[in-house]
Amino acid sequence: MNQADMIMLLKQEVVPALGCTEPVCAALGAAAAASLVDGDITAINLKMNPGLYKNGMAVSIPGFSRVGMKYAGALGAVLRNYKAGLQLLEGITPSISEAAIALVGKDIVHIEIVNEENLYAEAEVVTKSHRGRSIIRGNHSNIVFLSQDDKIVLDKRAAAGGNDLLHDKLYAMTVGEIYDLSQSADEKDLGFMLDGVKMNQAVSDYVAQHQVGIGIAKTLEKSMGGKIMGDNLASRIMYKVASCAEGRMTGCPFPVMSSAGSGNHGITVTMAIFETAMYFHSTDLELCRVLAFAHMLNVYIKMRTGKLSAMCGCGIAAATSVAAAIVYLQGGSKEQIGNAIINMAANITGMICDGGKVGCALKLATASNAAVMSSELAMNGVVIPASNGICAATPEETIANMGTVSKPGMTETDTTVVTLEVPIEYVDEVRSIYREK
């Protein structure tokens, strides 16, 4: 992979998103399908993999008073603005909200959970005259199929099964090679990395000025002035990531910069690293480079653990990337960066994902705190040895082990979590899907 490849990959994976990306994905698919039809909507049929449903069923939608994937699909069908991508929810108005609520109230929005291992969202929007259909696969905005009635408008399904060339190149790299590539980049090429800091900082500022969520961030902020937590780098990072996540999960009307398809991953990476860079008085160039490194490493880990899995990606992928980045910002060696990754694997691998919701703020705070501890241990020559559990001799082998723990290791965990969360009418369907796997 060369510099141009890295910039291109980062521009694919580090993008703005308004709202939790799972309901946004459902809305985007419905918007694309609805754009192909006219007239009054008589049915909206949504199909999605269990992980997508799990992550979107309990999270707030910005500018909207209801939660759930039915409402997300209805909003998309009314908006029809699929070309806005992951920011399509910016188009919500009171009249759009009323129309979406009315569609769900008519009981014409239906969801089917389907046996797809990776991210999958299919939408069919029906009117009296036409039937529009869309399929999103692989990542939250990757529309691979569109049809109007029997006429195929777009079909990229054959190419959607695997990674593209850029991701294949990243997959084959070592952590050290990702570090070297980021170190050689120019600020003019990586300046867009700072856009994510500004965007996510705006969400944190919004939370500081408004009553948002259930008080997680406010309490952490207050605790920094007390005797138990104190005001230090670890507590400030915990507060920053928690405030952004709590705001985003409860419908803050601002977009965040995502990473590897997840807004909370982007929050973890950008806010934790920005706070650390401020603490060490890093230059803008150093900040740009370390953000590029961490975003690339986050994608690298997610390619092993899965886009939507039983593991909390914010803790397992994003916060592990933060641990490596904190070592990076202190001038640590490649070996110490690798050791921070191994320490994180020993620490919080197995943290479950039980869907997108306000409680994610707690997990982001916990994982970020673990990142600070893991980096501090690594900088002082402490690493969990390869004979301990899933830890291996190299960060690459350890990351591969994390992936194996996720899939197939935690498939049954995902089954249990999803069946605990979904409405009773979906339980047997979900169990049968996981049995087939």
Question: What is the meaning of each model-derived region?
Answer:
Residues N2-V37, I41:
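N-terminal signal-anchor module of multipass membrane proteins
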Residues P16-A32, F254-M271, G313-A317:
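Conserved phosphate/anionic-ligand binding catalytic regions in large, soluble enzymes, centered on
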Residues P23-G39, G266-T283, A323-G331:
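Alpha-helical support elements that line or immediately flank enzyme active sites
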Residues K227-D231, S235, R248-H281:
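Membrane-embedded translocation segments of transport machinery
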Residues Q3, A17-T21, G51-L52, R137-S141, ...:
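A structural signal for small-residue-enriched, beta-sheet-centric alpha/beta enzyme cores
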Residues G105-G251, T416-K437:
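Signature of multi-pass transmembrane helix bundles
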Residues D40-I44, A84-L89, H110-E112, K188-L194, ...:
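Flexible, glycine/charged-enriched surface loops at secondary-structure junctions
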Residues T42-L86, E98-V109, E286-Q336, A340, ...:
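A structural-propensity feature for long, helix-poor, extended segments
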